[in-house]
Amino acid sequence: MSVGILGTKVGMTQFFDETGLSIPVTVIQVGPCVITQIKSMSTDGYNAIQVGYKQVVEQKLSKPLLGHLKKSQSPPLKYLREYLVESIEDFEVSQVFSTNIFEVGQKVNVSSKSIGKGFSGYQKRHHFSRGPMSHGSKNHRQPGSIGAGTTPGRVYPGKNMAGQMGNKKVTIKNLQIVSINIENDLLLLKGAVPGKQGALVKVSK
């Protein structure tokens, strides 16, 4: 598994390249992320690193979490994520990740929780076609048939129906890095990224 870096979605804007072409980009505030723990094959049975992000006041964290962070002399961090690695030799506790691990033109994968739309119907959630709106029709926004009769006598699992829409983890792959602002730890990614403004985002190579 590749090591990811955590960040916050700032919003969308446009970026003009050398030819004057307008490119829609998503601005992400990445890092700084701190390694809070290193797990090895000898002590834990697998190699992994634990990364923390977003410093907060101590009152917002539980005492067990604060005790865990103080073992590595880490600041109070709100988010902790673990990543499997083949070797732990290249990492050390308190090592900091930021925009310095990325390059302009590089393609990355971005994961975040999509915007929740609540309980949504067939047309909005699955893009079903609606029925006739006049001429005596009573089937306007209904799903139509959802299965057969006595055989099989049930609705098959996975049938597209109304229900909760959004609020799920979504990963967009191969988004190109258009620009990097090292001073403010900002990444400008070409295209859209899941989630609302302020959402927690994971960027991985």
Swiss-Prot record:
What is a GO molecular function of this protein?
Answer: structural constituent of ribosome
Where does the signal sequence lie? none
Tell me where on the tree of life, at the top rank, the source sits: Eukaryota
Which GO CC terms are listed, alphabetically? chloroplast; cytosolic large ribosomal subunit
Q: Does the keyword rRNA-binding apply?
A: yes
> A single GO BP annotation from the record?
translation
Q: Which InterPro entries match?
A: Ribosomal_uL3 (IPR000597), Ribosomal_uL3_bac/org-type (IPR019927), Ribosomal_uL3_CS (IPR019926), Transl_B-barrel_sf (IPR009000)
Q: What is its main location?
A: plastid
Region Disordered: start and end of each range?
127-153
Compartmental location:
Plastid, Chloroplast
UniProt keyword list: Chloroplast, Plastid, Ribonucleoprotein, Ribosomal protein, RNA-binding, rRNA-binding
**Similarity field:** Belongs to the universal ribosomal protein uL3 family.
How is the subunit organization of this protein annotated in UniProt? Answer: Part of the 50S ribosomal subunit.
The protein's job, in short, is: One of the primary rRNA binding proteins, it binds directly near the 3'-end of the 23S rRNA, where it nucleates assembly of the 50S subunit.
- Which NCBIfam families does the annotation name? L3_bact
What protein am I looking at? Large ribosomal subunit protein uL3c
Origin organism is Porphyra purpurea (Red seaweed)
Name of the coding gene: rpl3
